[in-house]
């Protein structure tokens, strides 16, 4: 329970496999758009600490410099594991703040992402898809398919709509 004014944020954690300086395939979302509520005046690091506690992750290093993350299953991903430019970065609302993680004061509805990069000099803030949005899109496709009913010449447009919706899921 939070006393005083509360600030609700979203938090995502995007990690990687340990693969050294070569062999990167893709990043993976470890925590997607978790709702984290902290007291007013809290820092981005406070949001991360609370999310990690809630989801069973732990920080390696300090809250002012996160040098690594350990997953609930005990796997650690640390700075320099995937090359000399690899490590953890953070973004708020799609942008990298010009202040350290323990210096950024969170605001209502901030979207905070802690993400691993293989090369900080060429880093891009990842987009985190909400699994609920994916399910809504899939449900919409299923509904369109079920609306087709018996396949006849007159159902051609319904089939085209369902196909277009399905194709949009795989983009």
Regions found by a protein language model. Name each.
Residues 1-4, 130-171:
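Beta-rich interaction/scaffold domains
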Residues 1-133:
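Ubiquitin-like/PB1-type beta-grasp interaction modules and other compact soluble beta-rich domains
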